Amino acid sequence: MLKNKFNASEVEPRLYKAWEESGAFKPRKPRPTDTPKDNYSIIIPPPNVTGSLHMGHAVNNTIQDILIRYNRMLGKAVLWQPGTDHAGIATQMVVERKLSKEQKQRKSMTRDEFLGHVWKWKSESGGNINQQLRRLGSSCDWSREKFTLGDPENSDDNMSEAVTKAFVDMYNKGLIYRDKRLVNWDPHFQTAISDLEVENIEKDGSFWHFKYPLAGGETYTYIEKDDEGNILLSEVRDYISIATTRPETMLGDGAVAVHPDDKRYASIIGKKVKLPISNRLIPIISDEYPDPNFGSGAVKITGAHDFNDYEVAKRHNIPLYSLMDECGVMVDSEFMPKKYVGMDRFKARKEVVKDIEEEGCLLLIEDKKVMQPFGDRSGVIIEPMLTDQWFVAADKLSENAINKVNDGSIKFVPDNWKKTYDHWMNDIQPWCISRQLWWGHQIPVWYGYAKDIIKDETSNTKKNDDKKQLIEFVAKSESEAISMAEAYYGCRVKIDNNKGKAENKIVKIWRDQDVLDTWFSSGLWSFSTMGWPNKTEELGRFYPTSTLVTAFDIIFFWVARMIMLGLHFMDDVPFNDIYIHALVLDEQGKKMSKSIGNTLDPLDLIEGVEIQELIAKRTRGLKNPDSAPKIAKATRKQYPKGFEAYGADALRFTLASMAGQGRNIRLSVDRIAGYRNFGTKLWSAATFGQLNRCNSSSSYAPKDVNHVLNKWILSEVSKTIDTVTNFIESYRFNDSADEIYKFSWDTFCSWYLELVKPILSDSHNAYNKETRETFGWVFDQILKLLHPFMPFITEELWHNLSESRPKMLIVSEWPALPYDITDESSVSDVKWLQMLVTNLRSVRADMNIPPSKMAPLLVLSTSLDERLNLFAGQLKPLARVSGISLSEVVPRGALQTVVEGVTYAIPLDGLLDKTVERDRLNKEISKIEVEISKIDNKLSNHAFVSNAPEKVVVLQKDRKLSYLDELEKLNLALINLN
């Protein structure tokens, strides 16, 4: 027997363990009849090893698990490949902080010593997120779990080999190269970072307007005009005006650019200006980049410290002046005024402004909000820096990747993301893949000095250090690098990371100390996880993968790169469909963020959390600690008791039901509670079925049923199966969830269960056995349809409702019928019954008639509809009908309703005290009229309508419409009563 209620906290972990131990998460064995369509695979977007489950993970993995469980039930061989990302900068930061608390510093250790600490941390604390994914119900094949950095203790692990082979192969084909280019530089971590790791935040700032004097004291007539050509200003100037938010960078200016169509500056294009402070002469150039309508229309070009300026500088061969070292400190260089050497960039900013003002070249300081780039982990302002890095020639890989999306080989869902993909790919830049970290795949490149330099050094012939040339030995291993070097030098070679040259006729080479961008190894994820570069059975069965489920913000950083690398190495797309899921927002529609304290931990919703712990979580690690009291107050107001334990099923179903294509999810805790109640409703229905011996039978044949109610429910479940299947296949998860919900709650529980009670309660009824078996069979279909969305409660019910199940629900067959069981006549008859019952209930409710009171039903017709006799047993309990009879006239004051053109009446005599009811109705009418008057006063107040937010005004208008509708019903009830 079923227990009184479903205990998610006890059942969910138990069932997950049973699934995993049974091998249900592993792909089934190949069959001789298998075709590619019989295999289905998804690669999990590998979460950071440092991470913990957040709502983005929850919706992403819920959708993946729905697809995985659905395809598994279709009988396919299913692989859901799990794993984690080594998360270079994030992991290194976590371990450095941990060591700092132990009074240890990375820089005081050797590389190997530090990496030993990181691997130890990973074995003890890393990968907690995988346990959290298990708690969500994710049915990954954990026996195949991968780590982007590989497993150094497992000789069979191929992940490191895959990355090294990919790098060497691409280098040999000219797709990877070393270059000096502009990158996002984090002065705190002293490494290049990706655009995704840069957080642009609006801050209070300034625009400093400077004068750059024309060289040689030249002048020109500066004229400003309005849109109609009228002259607003005309004056002779001996300078050009520029504005900047970063005054310190003017020390590295290489030019001033103006638009070719800007007539104000046409006469001075090609001339030079004298750079204040340093007094260097730089040219005025013509370029499309400046906007004549923004500021003065003239732009300083600092090619070594601004991405847009860098492109302008390249077009015009403008010199690049690097101002800072890796710490953001001004460098000692021939173009740098000695005063600034060794200054921090922000101190230099103040000094530059001060010195320019003293030179008389400061025009204006304008206070403005300024977008500033911050490192998302370091929290410091990012500096565009010109550094030596390794790059992928992405433009050589992009054309094929664009074509595969355009020809339909890869499909985006929703398809509007294809435009975003095309935009990025058609404007693709070299991909910086090197990072100045220790944690990661060390770049497989060794360096040595050119042969002529080695020869000169050993013969004591001195050469200028600036002319030294490095030879690159790109190899899959250290021994291979040594062999390559020995072939080049013609003598013995050894590794010496101190970058020596030669000693006792042994040449020294050293390895590149940088590591690869995490996105490089994760870009190989779709095939490296299946054993590449080895030719494995998994690659043959599961590559290309079927569907990628991911967020929009990594379409370029991960998705596009996987497509490019998959096509390059596998000569095939990495996946067929890309489903871009929605963003999870809070109830007010705001993006969830730790900084504003509105995040919700999925595990708190699954397992419950007390208010104090919830507040502690939301106020821990804030970028602005001063906001903690405000966040605590808001949290206490919104969730005064914290959260109940809603269970994984309720959270999953909520996320699925709100995951409409192209729509963000406004997560409501009330809605999660509502879907927990949905599970309770199913549990109650199952209990009712069990008490009435409603078990499905192996001999049950839906096509052989005879009773109209059973034919109807079979017709409805058949339609639901088709609809849900089509919705899942179309990635319409919200529609499929809603369809299951409506059928389960409304059609089955609210109608069928109630309609068949008279049959089930009568053991002598001819249709008792058929109805019990139909009930059980249909409920089984509900469990199957619902299983991908709510796997735990459905599996528990599946086992408890029958002890003879041959298989667990997780590996049972998806509902499908070999024949049509739709009976339109039965559907029509029951639809009529539902309309009649609904209408009768409605008119009774309008008059406040207690459900306990039975009433006769009068039919204004010459003959009784045969359906009244057919459903007499259902009408009496559901519509509280004491008897049915024909009538030629409607009794005075009787309640009336019309169904399919026939009038049905309920006499009021004896059902209620008319005087009491009349008083109640008049009071209700008066209350509503007062509310309508209040709303009218607000809406007629010009100040309210003008100043209130639009949604507040709309809400008042909607309230009025609702009150007017209610008022109409009350007046009608009063008329009927009188």
Regions found by a protein language model. Give the residues of each.
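N-terminal, positively charged nucleic-acid-binding surface of large information/translation enzymes
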Residues: 1-261, 302-315, 319-334, 345, ...
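Glycine- and acidic
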Residues: 1-2, 45-53, 111-115, 140-152, ...
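Conserved short loop/turn motifs at secondary-structure junctions
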Residues: 3-4, 83-84, 114-119, 143-160, ...
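Active-site-adjacent bridging/hinge elements
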Residues: 36-44, 66, 101-105, 130-138, ...
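Structured ligand/cofactor/substrate-binding pocket environments in proteins
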Residues: 56-68, 75-76, 84-85, 162, ...
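Short Cys/His-rich metal-coordination motifs, predominantly Zn2+-binding knuckles/fingers
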Residues: 189, 278, 378, 449-451, ...
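Feature 926 captures the class I aminoacyl-tRNA synthetase adenylation module centered on the KMSKS loop
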Residues: 209, 427-520, 524, 568-648, ...
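Short acidic, glycine-rich loop/turn motifs
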Residues: 212-222, 231-235, 260, 274-279, ...
